[in-house]
Curated annotation (Swiss-Prot):
Keywords: ATP-binding, Cytoplasm, NAD, Nucleotide-binding, Nucleotidyltransferase, Pyridine nucleotide biosynthesis, Transferase
Name by which UniProt lists this protein: Nicotinamide-nucleotide adenylyltransferase
Family: Belongs to the archaeal NMN adenylyltransferase family.
Source organism of this protein record: Saccharolobus solfataricus (strain ATCC 35092 / DSM 1617 / JCM 11322 / P2) (Sulfolobus solfataricus)
Gene Ontology MF terms in the entry: ATP binding; nicotinamide-nucleotide adenylyltransferase activity
Location(s) in or outside the cell: Cytoplasm
One GO CC term on file: cytoplasm
Protein's UniProt keywords contain Lipid metabolism: no
Gene3D superfamilies recorded: HUPs
CDD domains: NMNAT_Archaea
Gene Ontology BP terms: NAD biosynthetic process
Source organism, top-level taxon: Archaea
Catalytic activities: beta-nicotinamide D-ribonucleotide + ATP + H(+) = diphosphate + NAD(+)
Pathway named in the protein's UniProt entry: Cofactor biosynthesis; NAD(+) biosynthesis; NAD(+) from nicotinamide D-ribonucleotide: step 1/1
Length: 172
């Protein structure tokens, strides 16, 4: 059985992330989705809690009929030592053989630690980009088509859009 790791902050989880998960599951039997920066929330760059992000991811995967028995969703706090981060991750997760990542630092860290790294396609990175989506939310612009429907519904339900605008002082 093969198992891969897909690390990200998922602030918020969007359709690009969903496409990477689908792509990754074509290559491994099981996938660990690592929800990074789990200690962060209520900031402009990390507005959602780890628990909220886990719910966004799980609800989105259920919505598309994904087999959740093939998926682990694991929150993990940051450490400020990149040289041991890959080892740190391995202490939080089940064993994995391959890492799916596009972030150059993440790619470098896991390669140096001896892991196989596969770089997923960008899947329209200009649109499917959490920074861009957060900006649209702050501006009260349309972002609903950039995230899975369960994510959009959930963010409105928890008033995450209002939270983000209040954090930057632009509650319109």
């Amino acid at each position: 059985m093969s198992r891969g790791l897909y690390p990200g902050r998922f602030q918020p989880f969007h359709l690009g992330h969903l496409n990477v998960i689908k792509w990754s599951l074509e290559r491994v039997d099981e996938l660990i989705i690592l929800v990074g920066s789990s200690q962060e929330s209520h900031t402009v760059t990390n507005p959602f809690t780890a628990g909220e992000r886990v719910e966004m991811i799980r609800n989105s995967l259920k919505d598309v009929g994904m087999d959740l028995s093939r998926i682990y969703i694991i929150p993990m706090p940051d450490i400020l030592m990149n040289n041991i981060w890959a080892h740190y991750v391995s202490t939080y997760t089940p064993k994995f053989e391959v890492v799916f990542a596009r972030n150059p630092l993440v790619v470098r860290i896991f390669k140096e630690a001896g892991y196989k790294v596969e770089i997923p396609p960008a899947f329209n990175r200009e649109k499917y980009n959490s920074t861009y989506i957060r900006r649209l939310i702050i501006l009260n612009d349309n972002w609903s088509e950039l995230v899975p429907k369960p994510v959009y519904k959930y963010i409105l339900e928890i008033k995450g859009d209002q939270r983000l605008r209040e954090i930057v002082g632009t509650d319109k």
